[in-house]
């Protein structure tokens, strides 16, 4: 898929043309780990390395497996038809459980109206099937199965995906050195110590305890299951969505594909413009990753934008509408209570959450308690009928570092803990949303408070941004906070782009934001000691020392940018096998000099004494040449 162009796709036909070209990763192949059944094949990406050249000949370097979020879009053997959607990967698994029914029609009044509206017929996804719902009295959540001791195909899928089958590589000599890593410090997390410890039973236990979720609506059958939890790899979320002034359906699908190409583990559709229902349908039918929404946005749209006119009945219908489309998790701001709203009065930035401000306005206008809070049990009944996970929203998150960790923020957090317990009584999966803007020295307190008051439910944070002085660079200010809070225990990081606070991001901004957050998440995995996390670092470091430039590019998170930066100063093809870069040049490359010393030592029997002798001779040569570092 061409990445140089920043212009959005004008139509589904033009986007289809791009997808037909595939967005092949350099030197990579799509590989699958086989599960316990023929229809359980877990994807990963394998990066091929070139050989190391030595005086004695070539030494082969092994391929490196990496976690892959791109779904079938990067599989050359799969034909993608956007108008038909992706293959129904989970349909058989769900059907086999025997606890759901296929509905004769949509349950939502709004959904039915959209399905029969001639004005939107040209926008409608044509290949729709009737939605599923739990049988009366049944609970179809992954937490419910886990608490009954059932290991679902989704749980097995997650175990294989998280381990990357690294246990099969441990006894191979070519991987032994590459698989070494520093011990991590996990702040009390229950991390698996070895790849073989990441079993389906381990996943089941984490889901049953509420420490992790598998967001997987029974109506999102195209989904490749993944886990969000403190004791798994740190995940990242990317946002997309139309607004009143921008975007077409094709553009939003393109943003989704673009985001997962660069590594987004989940996508939140934050659409607030026209055709929200149709946009979401197209995204879901073509998405291999979980999709989250903020249902209050669409409910508000149904009132014409008047928060005071929101009703529980309208919101309930919106939940059912979206659940029957297949949304995997809902952000619900049920912790914005009437008594907390006055606590924001002395803040510099007040209430910055859109959902939080909507509910605060409703509470004040009616002088009633938040209807999301008072109807929470009814919301849980809907969630467990479709296996939609809660993302309990932080509607009172701080919008600047001056407002961080105040009474409003933590008061809401404690209420979210209360609601977590209530959701778990229904066996509904929960994660907790967090800030926001927090200076570095106050970041860990956010994690500690969440773990204590929300009982280790997965934490999902927006950054946090650790300073407010860098408009245009908030992917960096937030990436710093994200790496730290990920290390402390946050399970998923919501990306921030360079356009944060300034405007709507384009494709390159999205790419920049995702790569920044992949760095933060990986740094956190290294710090907490996720098994095998250092493999890619070690492989790239070895390639760097051996001047295998193509491998350096290909093993990186953004091969295109790395290659482009290198070629700005050394564009010739020969430079990609040269034993220097433009930073030091051929005479002063530290790695080249070190290799020369090693080679010299090897010629003198390659023992420690010879290495020391080699250094002494180099010292004599250096002094004879005038002892000048620069000439």
Curated annotation (Swiss-Prot):
InterPro entries hit by this protein: ThiC (IPR037509), ThiC-associated_dom (IPR025747), ThiC/Bza_core_dom (IPR038521), ThiC/BzaA/B (IPR002817)
Keywords: 4Fe-4S, Iron, Iron-sulfur, Lyase, Metal-binding, S-adenosyl-L-methionine, Thiamine biosynthesis, Zinc
Residues reported to bind Zn(2+): 437, 501
Pfam families cross-referenced by the UniProt entry: ThiC-associated, ThiC_Rad_SAM
Superkingdom of this protein's organism: Bacteria
Keyword Metal-binding: yes
GO MF annotation: an example: 4 iron, 4 sulfur cluster binding
Pathway: Cofactor biosynthesis; thiamine diphosphate biosynthesis
Cofactor: [4Fe-4S] cluster
PANTHER family assigned: PHOSPHOMETHYLPYRIMIDINE SYNTHASE, CHLOROPLASTIC, THIAMINE BIOSYNTHESIS PROTEIN THIC
Protein name stated in the entry: Phosphomethylpyrimidine synthase
Organism of provenance: Ralstonia nicotianae (strain ATCC BAA-1114 / GMI1000)
Chain's gene name: thiC
